[in-house]
Amino acid sequence: AICKKPSKFFKGACGRDADCEKACDQENWPGGVCVPFLRCECQRSC
């Protein structure tokens, strides 16, 4: 299963998954993707 949470560090509209991933990395979450409404969502295995 994959756990998801909104990024606390990401600011602004999410256009590139790589930028989102960097923000999630700071939160010790290995993955991050842009989701609808231009938000950054961090993901990791549960």
Curated annotation (Swiss-Prot):
The keyword Membrane does not apply. Keywords: Antibiotic, Antimicrobial, Disulfide bond, Fungicide, Plant defense. Transmembrane segments: none annotated. GO terms for biological process: defense response to bacterium; defense response to fungus; killing of cells of another organism. InterPro entries: Defensin_plant, Scorpion_toxin-like, Scorpion_toxin-like_sf. Leaves and flowers. Disulfide bonds join 3-46, 14-34, 20-40, 24-42. Belongs to the DEFL family. Strong inhibiting activity against C.beticola and other filamentous fungi. Little or no effect against bacteria. This is Defensin-like protein AX1.
